[in-house]
């Protein structure tokens, strides 16, 4: 390559990488995969090494991060939040080990390996044990003050167990299950979805309204101690132990290694285990454990010499998009789905991938017949990353979203501030079917044996069109359906009959009122106690309830201001469906004989129907004690969604574990 061509390519790569950095670090909206970014960066580093006369102090290869938006107050870090150098294979790790050993002149070295959490790096400042400020990494020198949003993350202690002044650093992230649920809600509401949990975490933390961040179920692992007053800690592993003792959440999967072979074994182990975690990791961080050796090795302008990040190979594959199918959800949102030639991604065969909405198809210029890059967002949901334009033949077909609903042929609309097309026909069969599936689901009426397949059979046979129709079903009708015998038909009729006794909150959630989730349904049920009282409530009365906002209050009032809905409630009454709250109020729990009396309970994960704070109050009102960690003295662990390391601790100490459903059964006895 001539010098002229090399110079031109270096300039192209710098412009490209600066754009990628801006999109990733400033806008929190990356346009390329990590694998593509890394390929461009490695090419730039190689060209600059071969052509040192073209080296520049502002090249992306030596610069840390990007600029800061003026939305939040700026914060200057007391010590720079440096990025880490990258390793992509075993050879890179051995080169790192060789450089470290040369730099410490024969001293013994021990490494500490940690999972590289794929989230948003933040710093936390404490004065005399109190959390006073939190900031994003920003460009490594200057970040943004996001204190109020970080206070909504329960994994971040507002007061430490000691009155110590320090700065801790960590990674805020969104659990995979929370990511899936958030995107499902955004799709139902016709909003843009997040591409992956990292974007979801970053987008949530950088919201100007802390209430939005509070609803996003974020968490955080602290991975380092930047400084601490009046205390010297000789090793990184001991600093993590100290942070854990102070009340921080540290990742339990770290390991100290005496040799580079042990480091490589750890990397290989977690490359296999990675899909089983409930949070995203994109590699392994390897650090020299001894702090004195770290100081001896020092740093470059961009990264410390005593640490490196091993990047896992990108879980991306190429396949052909053969078609686009449309589905209509229970709220009327029309979602396009890519049909793919079967391909293995992250251990499973993928045949379909979400395209989310029409805007995404246009932005990525996706056409039927294209070869596309596919990955699993959050290692869970298959998504189309981009089109391989070089493989186009000219025979690909442009796709246009229909103007009418594929299920009922009603005209589709795009509501104000929504990106999704929506069918607003209340009699749309697809919406009715999806609504029925939701009505019988686990957190709603929980009718055993009545899943999507059976609902579809009943719907296609014209046996059900409304929720109330379920309670008019007969055994004779069920026996007309495929796979139903005398016993299965009898069991299902009994399960439907049993569901009539459910408490009000299950019925409310099952109705599918827009913006009302399981937790809000329970709040309404406990507050009003009967359906009749809730139906009469005004918007002002609803907004006066803690955690109920204007949008939800309006939605509830609008829902019940409908003659068809009132007719449905009357039918429920005639069929004997309970419409009163059967749960126990905190005020009624005093002096009640309870399983929880005298027991120590740990709550972990997200409780769908009842928030953890409410669950804690009720357990304590029943004479129990709620603690934050599992030990030999723990009697019970209640595990909700995205339960983490406390489950492993429960198994280690042989502690009984309940899911939320079992917990609610005991609570409501």
Curated annotation (Swiss-Prot):
HAMAP family: DNA_ligase_A
GO biological process: DNA repair; DNA replication
Organism whose genome encodes this protein: Bacillus cereus (strain ATCC 14579 / DSM 31 / CCUG 7414 / JCM 2152 / NBRC 15305 / NCIMB 9373 / NCTC 2599 / NRRL B-3711)
The reaction(s) this protein catalyses: NAD(+) + (deoxyribonucleotide)n-3'-hydroxyl + 5'-phospho-(deoxyribonucleotide)m = (deoxyribonucleotide)n+m + AMP + beta-nicotinamide D-nucleotide
Name this protein carries in UniProt: DNA ligase
Keywords attached to this entry: DNA damage, DNA repair, DNA replication, Ligase, Magnesium, Manganese, Metal-binding, NAD, Zinc
InterPro entries xrefs: BRCT_dom (IPR001357), BRCT_dom_sf (IPR036420), DisA/LigA_HHH (IPR041663), DNA_ligase (IPR001679), DNA_ligase_AS (IPR018239), DNA_ligase_CS (IPR033136), DNAligase_adenylation (IPR013839), DNAligase_N (IPR013840)
Source lineage: Bacteria, Bacillati, Bacillota, Bacilli, Bacillales
Necessary cofactors: Mg(2+); Mn(2+)
Superkingdom of origin organism: Bacteria
This protein's record includes keyword Ribonucleoprotein: no
Active-site residues, Swiss-Prot/TrEMBL: 116 (n6-amp-lysine intermediate)
